[in-house]
């Protein structure tokens, strides 16, 4: 009896052992199946994203599998920049592991790829960590970017700097600074009182910097804003700075807005300063509309605020709006910060009412020097015909001066704050029309993108500010 009991016990133990081994084996099978499934999913993800244009590297450290996907260039070579970033992340992770050799996990190093143009590719390397949950499956524990966005040449795989993607010039720096200021104004995060501080953004462009991102439509820059603890990523439309982008890296999908051009060879641009005025500007607009004439208004930001709706009407009726400062000081006698205040407050005032930023600027009294022109950050529009309407306050004299100075390509200076100027307009337009003139805005007069730091007097007379 005792022997029989012993035999039964041994059989039971054997059965339990077999079952235990079977369970363990099944768990290992399920675990292996789960592991293979995760790897297959990641392989499929990368093939779907990049068509298999990569090389997979596998290794094991401290019980953890590390699987890396290295992209290839158009020359079918490993992208050394991405490989280096993944290598640094791998080394750092291995140092942190210190896990028991029985601990099992998988760390994937993948990349997100975005072609910005035929000759440039934007990459971001990503780490995904899977760990064992229970005894039979893997689950995603953590996913994170392991490096900043990297822009490389599609052909060579070489890391691109901002100075290679953009055209190295002072004009590029000025264009980009103005574009960034406007994008920040659009956010609505800056009050009228504080918006001038955006002018303090300096050293925005460093030609050797690589910490930028680029898409098919935007370039994204980290910008240190005065008073802000961390840099802010600012998106600038490539179409807005297309003239400053190296053609090799400018996406063909970017549509650069065409500058309207005049239809005839006898053109004249009428311009009005110091408005809008609630008592005069509406009458000026009525007369222009009646004659189907377009003009350019250089507005004061303070007057835009005091007379809401008029600058919007100017734009809606097809006129161009430029800046004339906030409250008409001589900018060459102001501090740098005050120049920023004068310009950016006006930009914000016009944008808040219209969704539009003035693209040109006429400094009060025409006073400008090289430093102020760069601080303004907009092309400078001067004039070739001064009616001196502010001095004479006589409608007949205003008309006479316009007619005496009128030539093809002339820019005429008037003010839409004087009733005598408004009264002169009907006769002035009628007589100019009889002489065959086409009335154009400043943009139409030149028919091309104007330069920051340059001043324009008429169609044939433009020069860099000194």
UniProtKB/Swiss-Prot annotation:
Reaction catalyzed: peptidoglycan-N-acetyl-D-glucosamine + H2O = peptidoglycan-D-glucosamine + acetate
Residues that coordinate or bind Zn(2+): 274, 324, 328
Extracellular side, ranges: 27-466
Enzyme class, UniProt record, top EC level: hydrolase
Cited function: Catalyzes the deacetylation of N-acetylglucosamine (GlcNAc) residues in peptidoglycan (PG). Also deacetylates N-acetylated PG. Does not deacetylate N-acetylmuramic acid. Confers host lysozyme resistance. Critical for virulence and escape from innate immune response of the host. Required for intracellular survival of bacteria in macrophages of the host. Required for successful host colonization. Controls the production of inflammatory mediators in the bone marrow derived macrophages (BMMs) of the infected mouse.
Originating gene: pgdA
Membrane topology reported for the UniProt record: Single-pass membrane protein
Protein residues bound to substrate: 365
SUPFAM superfamilies: Glycoside hydrolase/deacetylase
Family matches, as Gene3D superfamilies: Glycoside hydrolase/deacetylase
Subunit and partners: Homodimer. Interacts (via transmembrane domain) with PbpA1 (via transmembrane domain); the interaction is important for the peptidoglycan N-deacetylase function of this protein.
Domain NodB homology: residue ranges: 266-440
Superkingdom of this protein's organism: Bacteria
Location relative to the cell: Cell membrane; Secreted, Cell wall
EC number: 3.5.1.104
Segments in the Cytoplasmic topological domain: 1-5
Cofactor dependency: Zn(2+)
UniProt-recorded name of the protein: Peptidoglycan-N-acetylglucosamine deacetylase PgdA
Keyword Protein biosynthesis found: no
Up-regulation conditions: Transcriptionally up-regulated by response regulator DegU and abundant non-coding RNA encoded by rli31.
Pfam name, any one: Polysacc_deac_1
Effect of residue 5 to A: Loss of homodimerization, but interacts with full-length PbpA1. Reduced resistance against lysozyme
């Amino acid at each position: 009896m005792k022997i029989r009991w012993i035999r039964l016990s041994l059989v039971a133990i054997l059965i339990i052992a077999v079952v235990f081994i079977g369970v363990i084996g099944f768990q290992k099978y399920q675990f292996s199946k789960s592991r293979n499934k995760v790897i297959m999913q990641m392989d499929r993800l990368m093939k779907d994203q990049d068509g298999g244009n990569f090389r997979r590297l596998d290794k094991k450290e401290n019980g953890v599998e590390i699987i890396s996907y290295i992209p290839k260039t158009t020359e079918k070579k490993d992208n050394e920049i991405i490989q280096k970033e993944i290598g640094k992340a791998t080394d750092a992770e291995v140092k942190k592991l210190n896990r028991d050799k029985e601990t099992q996990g998988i760390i994937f190093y993948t990349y997100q790829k975005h072609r910005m143009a035929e000759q440039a590719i934007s990459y971001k390397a990503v780490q995904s960590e899977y760990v064992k949950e229970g005894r039979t499956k893997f689950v995603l524990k953590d996913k994170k970017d392991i490096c900043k966005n990297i822009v490389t040449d599609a052909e060579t795989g070489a890391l691109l700097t901002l100075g290679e993607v953009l055209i190295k010039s002072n004009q590029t720096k000025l264009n980009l600074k103005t574009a960034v200021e406007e994008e920040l104004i659009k956010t609505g995060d800056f009050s009228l009182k504080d918006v001038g501080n955006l002018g303090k953004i300096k050293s925005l462009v460093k030609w050797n910097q690589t910490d930028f991102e680029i898409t098919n439509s935007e370039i994204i820059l980290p910008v240190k804003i005065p008073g802000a603890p961390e840099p802010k990523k600012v998106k600038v439309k490539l179409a807005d700075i297309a003239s400053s982008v190296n053609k090799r890296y400018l996406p063909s999908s970017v549509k650069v807005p065409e500058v309207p051009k005049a239809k005839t060879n006898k053109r004249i641009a009428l311009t009005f300063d110091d408005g809008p005025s609630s008592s005069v500007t509406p009458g000026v607009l009525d007369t222009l509309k009646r004659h189907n004439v377009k003009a350019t208004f250089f507005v004061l930001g303070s007057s835009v605020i005091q007379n809401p709706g008029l600058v919007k009407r100017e734009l809606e009726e097809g006129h161009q709006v430029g800046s004339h400062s906030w409250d008409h000081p001589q900018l060459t006698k102001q501090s740098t910060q005050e120049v920023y205040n004068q310009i950016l407050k006006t930009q914000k005032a016009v944008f808040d009412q219209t969704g539009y930023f003035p693209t040109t600027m006429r400094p009060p009294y025409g006073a400008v020097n090289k430093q102020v022109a760069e601080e303004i950050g907009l092309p400078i529009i001067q004039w070739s015909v001064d009616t001196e309407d502010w001095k004479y306050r006589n409608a007949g004299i205003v008309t006479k001066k316009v007619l005496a100075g009128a030539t093809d390509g002339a820019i005429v200076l008037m003010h839409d704050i004087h009733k005598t100027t408004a009264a002169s307009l009907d006769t002035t337009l009628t007589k100019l029309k009889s002489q065959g003139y086409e009335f154009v805005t400043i943009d139409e007069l030149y028919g091309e993108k104007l330069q920051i730091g340059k001043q324009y007097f008429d169609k044939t007379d433009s020069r860099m500010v000194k």
